[in-house]
Amino acid sequence: MSFELPSLPYANDALAPYMSAETLDFHHGKHHQTYVTNLNNLLKDHELQSSSLEDIVVKASKDASMTGIFNNAGQHWNHILFWQCMKPNGGGPIPSELEGRLNNDFGSVEQFKEAFIQAGTTQFGSGWAWLAIDNGKLVVTKSPNASNPLVDGMKPILGCDVWEHSYYIDYRNKRPDYLKAFLDSLVNWEFVASQLD
């Protein structure tokens, strides 16, 4: 099986001013494409070449000899979710089922947002901030580099890339501002809610 770079579900200038066309051109067209190309090259004649992307991520995470496969498969999986988690004119009202779950598991939507921004801000170096389902409960977590909650048996439903290439053109070193803009103005809450099942 060969993996392909998915098309963005919006025009590359549609997320401005919160994420510029320049950022998307580099992030999607260069960085994400490189992960896909590297993954396909690493999987040639490999026992995992016909496995699903999710299976590759989980299996490669448990085997140090597959670090290259894990890094590129993880980044490919993470970015597929990341692109879907955003939309033009995002943010806004959260669907009632998801809002209820956030209120129940975090105390309030605002407390969830604070926890998410804190996770992304305190992720040292490159990585991701996540909202995931862990044994039926919504949790905020973070992961370094290409890792994600799948490797810990959780289901990620919202992910934000905190590698510098995801925000440095638009926000420079202001990662908290990027995370706030992501939650308030970019997130496709309908998509996130659809992942609850």
Where are these regions (language model features)?
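Feature for soluble, non-membrane regions of globular proteins
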Residues: 1-197
